[in-house]
Amino acid sequence: MVNAADLLAAAVRDGRLERSSGVSPHEHPLAARSYLSDGTGLAWHVPSALRSHGTFVLDAEIPRPVRSTLVRRYGVDDPDTFAERWTRAEALAKLADLPIITWLSRHGLTVPEHVGALRDVGETDWSTERFGDVIVTFAVTAHAQRADTSEERSPAVGGTV
């Protein structure tokens, strides 16, 4: 089995992150994608040599003032800290194949101790970084073993992996 931390490091290092107004599945069929509040989006082009070893997702947000209802619910009022935690929760929910509302009701903005055990997907790792005005969480679940490599996998964008 490939180590998730090594996979993630290689994908972030060797992949390409593209911000544009068009990040649809039609325009970027093999990229992990996330849409931003300003109408643009990010497409993360993971090198093809890595894609067969894991499921790669990302989530991104432009930090904004945190609504008072969210401050009360999650106890975070700093926009950057909230965006970091939110994108991490979104990315991990995508890997767990859960709608974000389900993730939030179960875990809030925290990471469960055994996040890789959320479903039978394998070892999981993530990294949250800032790119200009955007906070991005990259995440991967390493595939334990892949018997059939004849079909190309399309990474998740929404709540489905």
Q: Can you say where each PLM-predicted feature lies in the sequence?
A:
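Core catalytic alpha/beta fold that binds nucleotide/phospho-ligands
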Residues: 1-161
